[in-house]
From Swiss-Prot:
<feature type="repeat" description="ANK 5">
    <location>
        <begin position="219"/>
        <end position="251"/>
    </location>
</feature>
<feature type="compositionally biased region" description="Basic and acidic residues">
    <location>
        <begin position="451"/>
        <end position="479"/>
    </location>
</feature>
<keyword id="KW-0040">ANK repeat</keyword>
<dbReference type="Pfam" id="PF12796">
    <property type="entry name" value="Ank_2"/>
</dbReference>
<keyword id="KW-0677">Repeat</keyword>
<protein>
    <recommendedName>
        <fullName>Ankyrin repeat domain-containing protein 33B</fullName>
    </recommendedName>
</protein>
<feature type="repeat" description="ANK 1">
    <location>
        <begin position="80"/>
        <end position="109"/>
    </location>
</feature>
<feature type="repeat" description="ANK 2">
    <location>
        <begin position="116"/>
        <end position="146"/>
    </location>
</feature>
<feature type="repeat" description="ANK 3">
    <location>
        <begin position="150"/>
        <end position="179"/>
    </location>
</feature>
<feature type="modified residue" description="Phosphoserine">
    <location>
        <position position="397"/>
    </location>
</feature>
<feature type="region of interest" description="Disordered">
    <location>
        <begin position="1"/>
        <end position="75"/>
    </location>
</feature>
<keyword id="KW-0175">Coiled coil</keyword>
<feature type="compositionally biased region" description="Low complexity">
    <location>
        <begin position="372"/>
        <end position="394"/>
    </location>
</feature>
<feature type="coiled-coil region">
    <location>
        <begin position="451"/>
        <end position="479"/>
    </location>
</feature>
<feature type="repeat" description="ANK 4">
    <location>
        <begin position="185"/>
        <end position="214"/>
    </location>
</feature>
<feature type="region of interest" description="Disordered">
    <location>
        <begin position="354"/>
        <end position="394"/>
    </location>
</feature>
<feature type="region of interest" description="Disordered">
    <location>
        <begin position="426"/>
        <end position="486"/>
    </location>
</feature>
Length: 486
């Protein structure tokens, strides 16, 4: 039996023979050089035990501990190794890595690679070090599209390994990420994720705008065909489902939370049913088996529930987070920008709008008159004085006035006034304000009077006056005539 191990285009290099029974040397029988073969007493000592060919990788075995180009044996004992970004990333030392990033490393230090051509970002994506990837996102000079000796990028490595958190972080927080970068075999990140059956990574890459119709140069298969070729049925189903419904409409600002009417309700006649028809419909709905297939169809009740709970206007989502671009939801085949690119574009638009408003507001105030100095005063001709423009626009008119008027004595921002009054004595009792009267033109607030109450009051006064007049008339009639004569 022959075992293949080590580097090579076919996944094997050195030929190793299994232990044989005590027989004469093969060199005496065949005349071959005995140095061409190596005999092993134990299979655990074979180099193939450390092979990672099962992960579809062709890195030479036995090099995970050696992170740099300099081997550990070449470093003398007692001499501490220099702390580099590559060593910190390979050891998942986030504290040291952040300290090195704050120090401001050079481009050579950031692009340091191991013997396989992998940078610290690719190694972190390979092992699934999420905190290391987050720390490297803040490091300058990081090339997210760097390819190792096999042409694999950080995105290809993370998607192939199935690290969906790192894949989403690379897609969202690394500007300039190339989704269609291929390795030496012509495979993209979506193809590698489909081959390995990483359904979550396939979904993330497709919603980020990866090309679903891309084909490799050797076999000419698409990602869906590669998933079917390698027996990844779940990946095939996910790709087919996303191609049928490419855009999640609940993530847009035009989505409505209303449940659409079913086809039966739309086709149902508007005429009213009699008692017998309603009773028949009730019996039919009762005896009919309510299977889950009707609710799991597209546009059904469960589909609407999922859309409603995950939409931007859902109470569970609107309170927790706020999307950056609600007018541009993700879609299959449409390239999605990183968060930094979206915020930069929106910040530029807001800055331009604010600058235009500030310019319009500050133009009338930014015109000043230029007065000549005392040393340069000289008689000028009327033509020269007429040709010189009087108003001169300030060069710094684009700056806000509060920044231009800032000084060490009086800043541009208006300082509020604070008045402090002495506390009164404990026995102090405030005087009640005198009543200002019920005049209508008073500046103080008054109790409102309703119109119906005023009319009722006027009617009562009129009735009292009428009764009083009638009483006086009756009194005059009852008086004797001799009193009237006098």
């Amino acid at each position: 039996m022959v075992l293949l191990a080590g580097p090579g285009p076919e996944g094997g290099g050195t030929r190793c023979l299994s232990p044989q029974s005590p027989t004469p040397p093969r060199s005496e029988q065949t005349g071959e050089d005995p140095a061409d073969y190596e005999e092993y007493e134990d299979f655990s000592s074979l180099p193939d035990t450390r092979s990672i060919a099962s992960d579809d990788s062709f890195y030479p075995p036995g090099g995970e501990e050696e992170y740099g180009s300099v081997s550990a044996e070449s470093v003398p004992e007692g001499v501490p190794e220099a702390a580099t970004l590559l060593r910190a990333a390979c050891a998942n030392d986030v504290g040291l890595l952040r300290a090195l990033v704050r120090r401001g490393p050079s481009s050579e230090e950031v692009r340091e690679t191991d013997r396989n051509g992998r940078t610290g970002l690719i190694v972190a994506c390979y092992h699934g070090f999420v905190d290391t990837v987050v720390a490297l996102a803040e490091c300058p000079h990081v090339d997210v599209n760097w390819q190792d000796s096999e042409g694999n990028t950080a995105l290809i490595t993370a998607a192939q390994a199935g690290h969906v958190t790192i894949t989403n972080y690379l897609l969202n927080y690394f500007p300039g990420l190339d989704l269609e970068r291929r390795n030496i075999f012509g495979f993209t990140a979506l193809m590698k994720a489909a081959m390995q059956g990483r359904t979550e990574c396939v979904r993330a890459l497709m919603m980020a705008g990866a090309d679903v119709q891309a084909r490799d140069p050797r076999r000419g298969l698409s990602p869906q065909e590669w998933a079917a070729y390698t027996g990844r049925a779940e990946a095939v189903r996910v790709i087919q489902r996303l191609m049928e419904r490419p855009c999640p409409e609940q993530f847009g600002d035009k989505y409505k939370l209303e449940l659409p009417l079913p086809a039966e309700a739309v086709l149902k006649k508007s005429g009213s049913k009699n008692c017998l028809q309603r009773f028949t419909a009730f019996l039919r709905s009762t005896l009919t088996s309510r299977s889950s297939g009707q609710s799991l169809e597209d546009g059904g009740v469960l589909d609407h529930m999922v859309r409603m709970t995950t939409s931007l206007y859902s109470p569970a989502v609107a309170v927790v987070c706020q999307t950056v671009c609600p007018e541009n939801p993700p879609c299959v085949g449409k390239r999605r920008l990183a968060v930094q690119e979206i915020l930069a574009a929106r910040g530029n638009l807001n800055a331009q709008a604010q600058d235009s408003n500030k310019v319009e507001c500050s133009e009338p105030q930014s015109q000043i008159l230029e007065t000549p100095r005392a040393s340069s005063r000289s008689p000028k001709s009327p033509a020269a004085s007429r040709s010189t423009p009087a108003p001169v626009t300030r060069k710094a008119s684009l700056l806000p006035l509060q920044l231009l008027r800032r000084s060490s004595v009086r800043p541009g921002v208006v300082v509020p006034r604070v008045r402090i009054s002495k506390a009164p004595a404990p026995t102090f009792q405030p005087e009640r304000a005198a009543s200002k009267g019920n005049t209508k033109d008073s500046i103080y607030l008054q109790i409102p009077k309703w119109r119906y109450k005023e009319a009722k009051e006027e009617k009562r006064k009129a009735e009292e006056a009428e009764k009083k007049r009638q009483a006086e008339a009756q009194k005059e009639k009852r008086a004797p005539r001799w009193r009237k004569r006098t």
